[in-house]
């Protein structure tokens, strides 16, 4: 592999050190390596902000691992940044000098504002949804809050609180008592209060979280079969569960990994304070943050107006998809959706996911015609899809799995991006659009009227269409039968 196409970003965080190695290919980024080590640098800071020898040694040990991988990458294509703990440490110079010797490249201690800007860039490049966003990143010793529109930030704040420092300060007795949570939340709200008005003034349509705490919450919710939106009610529920566990070493929540458990209660307390102080309705996981911001910055790639569209284009190119056919199916599905939207009340995000499924429905053909829906579902489940959340990826894979042949109803019910009933409705529209666009020519798509009454669909074709299209009639009869097996009434006239 040509080493000039490789880029590396290293983030010396207060809780973990991370390394991301990517390859730039045709304007998109392919992740090659992700290495993360819990160094807990912030835990080595004493009251005088002196970093202990043990903490520094943990950091250097980790960097020796990273250094081996960096040898293959040109130095101008490597960026190493250090954040809150090394901003604070009075003896940071000693740590950084040795770190630079180990890595063989410069280490830059970045300001809180620069960290916030990079986090925003990373999220903007990799997260779909509305353009106007609030990005929250709870680190080990600092928390970044950024508002922005598209690629432009409108306000940037880096606050002195993090999951490691709050752990040492409010849960040092390892006791998960209500009082400890109350103290941690109150302190976090005190830190937030001076910046809350400005953040609210700039406003946001979507809120995304880009930290280990939010990642942990996502894993918990997926494991417990909840939808992926983080809400204050869910956070309070998890806090009560933590309090019931009593002690940090006894903390057990389904979906919470052992490595995330230590700083989970302190991160949770900070997040509850952020939700309360800023009156956040819901939050989802960002596709990327600081490291992605560094990589995209080195590549000078512009933030797309629509990240999901860029992702779909890249995948279609990679798997040699017939884009005319994909657009034909999407146009028909959208037409069907407009005809039933009053009866079925399908939300804009559900529409967008249906149209995404249309754009990708033939990627399985790049593997083999036989079992193409299975191949398509597998590919979507395992591909990196910037702009789509894990739950949305699962829904797309499920729709592609059920694009033809008998319907696997249980798979539509196991995804958690949309309610099961909505997943069923999207699946029905996708199947009909694929069926009627099957001859791959615009002039051969009949005029179709679709009406919905509850779950009953009535499909009306031009008068003599069925008589003149015996194969088409056979396919429609078969589809009608398959839909009836799962109690989806389809009346064709």
Curated annotation (Swiss-Prot):
Entry-linked Pfam families: Ppx-GppA, Ppx-GppA_III
GO BP term (any one): guanosine pentaphosphate catabolic process
InterPro entries named among the record's database cross-references: ATPase_NBD (IPR043129), GppA/Ppx_hydrolase (IPR050273), Guo-5TP_3DP_PyrP (IPR023709), Ppx_GppA_C (IPR048950), Ppx_GppA_N (IPR003695), PyroPPase_GppA_Ppx (IPR030673)
Catalytic activity from the UniProt record: guanosine 3'-diphosphate 5'-triphosphate + H2O = guanosine 3',5'-bis(diphosphate) + phosphate + H(+)
GO molecular function: guanosine-5'-triphosphate,3'-diphosphate diphosphatase activity
Cytoplasm found in the keyword field: no
Gene3D superfamilies tied to this protein: 3.30.420.40, Exopolyphosphatase. Domain 2, Hypothetical protein af1432
Membrane spanning stretches: none
Assigned keywords, A-Z: Hydrolase
Pathway where this protein functions: Purine metabolism; ppGpp biosynthesis; ppGpp from GTP: step 2/2
SUPFAM superfamilies in the record: Actin-like ATPase domain, HD-domain/PDEase-like
Main enzyme class: hydrolase
Entry EC number(s): 3.6.1.40
Function field: Catalyzes the conversion of pppGpp to ppGpp. Guanosine pentaphosphate (pppGpp) is a cytoplasmic signaling molecule which together with ppGpp controls the 'stringent response', an adaptive process that allows bacteria to respond to amino acid starvation, resulting in the coordinated regulation of numerous cellular activities.
Family: Belongs to the GppA/Ppx family. GppA subfamily.
Record-linked PANTHER family: EXOPOLYPHOSPHATASE, RETROGRADE REGULATION PROTEIN 2
HAMAP family for this protein: GppA
Name used for this protein in its record: Guanosine-5'-triphosphate,3'-diphosphate pyrophosphatase
Origin species: Salmonella paratyphi A (strain AKU_12601)
